[in-house]
Each structure stands twice: as C-alpha cells, then as structure tokens.
A protein has these predicted regions:
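Conserved beta-strand/loop scaffold segments within soluble protein domains that form the structured core
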Residues: 1-2, 6-174
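A short, hydrophobic C-terminal helix/tail in secreted or cell-surface proteins
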Residues: 178-182
Length: 182
C-alpha cells in the first residue's frame, strides 16, 4: 500500500515559532511519501521534527523544500528496522537575507539489505547560513545494507556560511580465537 502526505508551512501574520512533529510507521510492504514545503516569513521560525520506523519492505520517500524567509530547524530520524526497508530523502532550499537552515538527519540500518539515499541541494545568498548533519548508522546485523549521502550547494557571496558534517557509522565485530593461532 502507498500513502502520500503533504504539509505546507506558510507565513503567519506575525513573528513567532511554529513547532511540528510528524511520526510515521511504514508497515510491511508499504510506502509513505512525505512532502513538506516550508515557506515561513521573516522573523518566523519553524521547528520541524520527522520520525519514521520502516518494517520489512517498508519505505519512506521524503521531499522537503525550504523557501521563504524564516529560519528552519529540521530534525529527521528514520529506523530501517527490518529487511529490505528503505529511505530516500531529498532536500532542496533557497536561503537568503541572513536566513538559517539547520538540519540533523539520522538513519539507522537494523535490517539486512536496507538502503538509504540522502540528497541535499540548495543555494545560499545574502549572509544566509546552513548546517547539515547527516548520519548513516549501520547497526550490527545490517548485512548487505547500503547508504549514500550527496550534496550540492551554490554559494552566492562571500558572506554565506555553509557547513556539512557527514558521518557514517558501522558496527564492527572483533574476533578472537585460539583456533586462529593454529
């Protein structure tokens, strides 16, 4: 089964904060597509939190677009708990006028033959700031799983700040045996 969810965060009448939490559960053989368009106005902050658990053959396809003038703080946590689960995350942004975009994306591979693909592309101008922390964690038991993270950023000016912190974690087994000495 498949489901598509669309969120639009539009400018409010006054400055302030908006906090949104989206929790998803992709059951066996299901696919969830989450599309989020973030268009906050100047002086408006968006705190966005997405969490998803994917069972066997479960998938999350995430598309996030950041436009507008407000600051965005984005947290994404996905657990690929069963075999053949997957995450495809695509993030696009146009940041300007000292706008801030702070992303912390974590995907944990538990099942076998799981897959994660993370693509973040955008443009920074007018003293805008972006920090992207992307972590792909291969937990013990996630044999034959794969993950990829790519990013393309267009920097329009010497006053922009672009920080990217990619992390890949991989559980390691250490074997010791007297038989190895034979």
């Amino acid at each position: 089964s498949e489901m598509c969810i669309r969120d639009r965060f539009e400018p409010a009448q006054a400055a302030g904060q908006l906090a949104v939490r989206t929790e998803l559960y992709a059951k066996k053989d299901s696919r969830i597509r989450l599309v989020q368009v973030m268009m906050r106005g100047e002086g408006q902050e968006l705190l966005n939190d997405v969490g998803c658990i994917c069972e066997e053959n479960g998938a999350l396809d995430l598309l996030q677009v950041v436009v507008g003038k407000g600051d965005v703080y984005d947290g994404i946590w996905t657990e690929l708990q069963k075999d053949h689960a997957s995450l495809q995350a695509e993030i696009g942004y146009l940041l300007q006028n000292q706008q801030k975009f702070d992303v912390n994306l974590n995907v944990r591979h538990f099942g076998k033959v799981t897959e994660s693909t993370i693509q973040a592309d955008g443009t920074l101008m007018d003293a805008a700031e972006k920090i992207f922390r992307g972590t792909i964690d291969f937990v013990r038991g996630s044999a034959d799983s794969v993950g990829a993270e790519t990013e393309q950023v267009l920097l329009l000016g010497d006053d922009v700040v672009n920080k990217t912190i990619p992390v890949i974690l991989c559980a390691c087994l250490l074997y010791t045996s007297d038989a190895a000495d034979d």
